Amino acid sequence: MKHFFAIFFMAVTILSCGNAKVKEYKLEVVAEYPHDTDSYTQGLFFDEGQMYESTGQYGLSTFRKVDLQTGKALQRLDFNDDYFVEGSVMFKGNLYVLTWTSRKAFVYDAQTLEYKSTWKYPREGWGLTHDGTHLIASDGSANIYFMDENFAQKRKQLVTLEGRPVRFLNELEYIDGKIWANVYTTDSIVIINPKDGKVTGLIDCTGLLPKSFYEPSTDVLNGIAYDKKTGKIYLTGKNWPRLYEVRLIEKK
């Protein structure tokens, strides 16, 4: 489990957005679904209408093909105890899975989930998505990395909110030409313009999971999935008992 023993600046939640280009949103819950409380969610995405999830922790890391209605795994990969699995995505016929500090990434066949190869990865693995051309990754800093299918870096982009770097970028999702990113340990999601790294939107997810659902194992918000087939957006968190379909409402 990642720990930061420092006072974390809450820039994304407390900065006043004087810039009219930065829109602020709250959430409307459209529907809710069961989510496995053993899932320390690191990656969440849809591919061809099917939901997938990668989960972390040493000795507990998995990749799962998940039934949305029940939250149960239809197919599952379990990883060696040496690996703390992070973000994942399907891209160009392959499944890509990152690890946190092992500096390794795994590639599987997207259809069968059969193992194909292991790659040396140049940084900590955190979030992972794609824009149809490049893999896009975070590493817990304020940077996002654009890579080809062999993890060769093509571009690095600093993410800023009103000129200030936004650190701890975590799980990523590419939605309608923008990158959505969880900001680790906060209830905030930032919407990023991939061309210049500027934050164009702030999503306040405070209270998404009601306190009545909290258990000692309940952890932070992390997990953004966009189903292109339906246009629906889903959010969850680490060891949460629920996954939510949500809609954005712009704050007045």
For the regions a protein language model found, what residue spans apply to each?
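Surface-exposed loop and turn segments in beta-propeller and other repeat-based domains
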Residues: A31-Y33, Q75-D81, Q157-P165, G201-E215
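Blade-loop segments of beta-propeller domains
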Residues: G71-V107, L113-G125
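Short loop/turn segments that connect beta-strands within beta-propeller blades
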Residues: V66-G71, D109-L113, D148-A152, N193-G197, ...
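Hydrophobic, well-structured mid-protein blocks that either form specific transmembrane helices
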Residues: A105-E162
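A short helix->beta-strand "capping" segment at the edge of beta-propeller domains
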Residues: A20-D38, L68-L74
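Conserved beta-strand positions in repeat-built beta-propeller and related beta-rich domains
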Residues: E53-Q57, Y96-S102, A137-S141, A181-T185, ...
